[in-house]
Amino acid sequence: MIILDNSIQTKKRTDSLSKLITVNTLGPEGTSSEYAAKHFISNFTLLQGLNSKLSLHDTFESCIERTLQSPLEYTIVPHAYDGIKHFYMRPDLQLLQIFRCDTPMYGLAVRPDFEFRDDMLDTSVIVSHPSPINLIKYFTRKDVRFKLVNSTSQAARKVKEGLYDIALTNELARQKYGLTFVKTFKSIPMSWSLFGKGDVDDEN
C-alpha cells in the first residue's frame, strides 16, 4: 500500500521510464529490507513499467551514498531503523514514498544439531540486528545479552558459522542458512520510506 505517492517519475525523473533504476537497501540476502524492496519492485516499479534492479549493501548509509550519486538510484529504509531520522534532515535527499510491508516471521534460530533449552536465555549471548531486540523482552520477559550486527541475515550467518549459538532473525534468513526456529514471535508490522536524490544542487 502506497501511503504517499509522489511518483518517482516526478521532478525531472521522466528519464527513469526508459533507463534502469536501482533500488538500494540493506543486505545481505535474507534481510527484511530485501523482502520489502522486492515487494516494492513487484507492486510499484513493475506496474509503472519501470526497469529496475535491486542492490544490497552492508549499511543504510552506504545505500544513501549510492543514491546521492544518481537520480536513478533510490534507497528503501524501515522506520524501525534509528538512523533514518538523519536522512529526513538532509537537503540532498528527498522523501518520495512511504509504504507498508510487514516483515517475515521473526524468532530465535539455532543450528539443527544444537540442543536449545529455555534457561540458556539467561546466560547465552544472542546475535541480532538492533531493531528487533525488544521482541525478546516482550515475548520471553528475559533480560538477555546481545551481540549486535548490521542485519538479521548476518546474525543468522554467524550462527551457521558456529560463532554464536542463537540468533534473533527472520524466516528468510533462517531458511537461507539452514537454521531451526526454537521460538517464533511475530511478523512485524512495518512501514518504509523511499528516498531519492534531492534537488539541492538545482536550487543553488
From Swiss-Prot:
Please give the superkingdom of this protein's source: Bacteria
Explain the induction of this protein: The compound guanosine 5'-diphosphate 3'-diphosphate (ppGpp) is essential for the transcription of the bacABCDEF operon and BacG, and GTP regulates the transcription of both this operon and ywfH via the CodY-mediated regulation system.
What reaction gets catalysed by this protein?
Answer: prephenate + H(+) = 3-[(4R)-4-hydroxycyclohexa-1,5-dien-1-yl]-2-oxopropanoate + CO2
State the UniProt keywords alphabetically: Antibiotic biosynthesis, Cytoplasm, Lyase
Say yes or no: keyword Cytoplasm present: yes
Keyword Cytoplasm present in the record's keywords: the answer is yes
- What's an example of a GO molecular-function annotation for this chain? carboxy-lyase activity
Q: Which Gene3D superfamilies match?
A: Periplasmic binding protein-like II
- Give its E.C. classification number: 4.1.1.100
Localized where?
Cytoplasm
One GO CC term of this entry?
cytoplasm
Q: Enumerate the Gene Ontology biological process terms.
A: antibiotic biosynthetic process
Question: Which pathway does this polypeptide act in?
Answer: Antibiotic biosynthesis; bacilysin biosynthesis
Q: Which family does it belong to?
A: Belongs to the prephenate decarboxylase family.
Q: What is the role of the protein in this entry? A: Part of the bacABCDEF operon responsible for the biosynthesis of the nonribosomally synthesized dipeptide antibiotic bacilysin, composed of L-alanine and L-anticapsin. Bacilysin is an irreversible inactivator of the glutaminase domain of glucosamine synthetase. BacA is an unusual prephenate decarboxylase that avoids the typical aromatization of the cyclohexadienol ring of prephenate.
Supply the name of the protein.
Prephenate decarboxylase
Organism of origin is Bacillus subtilis (strain 168)
